[in-house]
Amino acid sequence: MERRICIAIDGPAAAGKSTVAKLIANRLSYVYIDTGAMYRALTYRALQCGVDIHDEQALLSLLGDTSIELKPSPQGQLVFVNGEDVTDIIRGEAVTNAVSFVAKHPLVREEMVARQRALAEGGGVVMDGRDIGTNVLPNAEVKIFLKASVEERARRRHEENIARGFPSDLEKLKEEIAHRDRIDSERETAPLRKAPDAVEIDTTSLTVEEVAARIMEIVNERIG
């Protein structure tokens, strides 16, 4: 029987992590775990409940009362918060601009990481985020770090927003993505960085299929 491993895919906002991770998970019949969606789900709940996103204890208390479920479906992964389908709404501008502030709190990350590790027990998972290879799954058999230029990432996010029916301003997106990069890279707890043993792939001029093919080569080497 083929060994079921853990695959960690990290990188900055809009580097193509989720798209590629879903594709890899589908090809391997693995479970896809979008850790960013978990932080977005908590951020959505905080905004909904009027909880200060800079108040760590208030967020931790809210998280304790929040059920976050990731469910596969023919349309892709669905995200539920306390039974409510929030898959699309957590991709909106309000959540996008607030999520980095929520994700930088050490105690919030500690609880989220515990939940993420529990989901990965037994292997057979593809998990993407900012600190999977360095912090959440440091022993993952395959670690990938995706990067792309700010301009290309803004263009991708712009197209995603339009496809979802969200208003979108390309120049504003460039500024927001650069700002998120700074917050994610400079936070004290589990900052965005490439694991020493991760394979770095610049996706700026690559198609999703080309990136997926490269990752599958690495996975097959490790499984074999």
Curated annotation (Swiss-Prot):
Localization, UniProt: Cytoplasm
Keyword Lyase: no
CC per GO annotation: cytosol
One of the GO biological process terms: pyrimidine nucleotide metabolic process
Key words of the record: ATP-binding, Cytoplasm, Kinase, Nucleotide-binding, Transferase
Enzyme class: transferase
GO terms for MF: ATP binding; CMP kinase activity; dCMP kinase activity
Record-listed E.C. numbers: 2.7.4.25
Catalytic activity: CMP + ATP = CDP + ADP; dCMP + ATP = dCDP + ADP
Source organism superkingdom: Bacteria
InterPro entries named in the record: Cytidylate_kin (IPR003136), Cytidylate_kinase_dom (IPR011994), P-loop_NTPase (IPR027417)
Listed Pfam families: Cytidylate_kin
Binding site residues for ATP: 11-19
Family, similarity comment: Belongs to the cytidylate kinase family. Type 1 subfamily.
Official protein name in the record: Cytidylate kinase
Organism: Geobacillus thermodenitrificans (strain NG80-2)
Gene: cmk
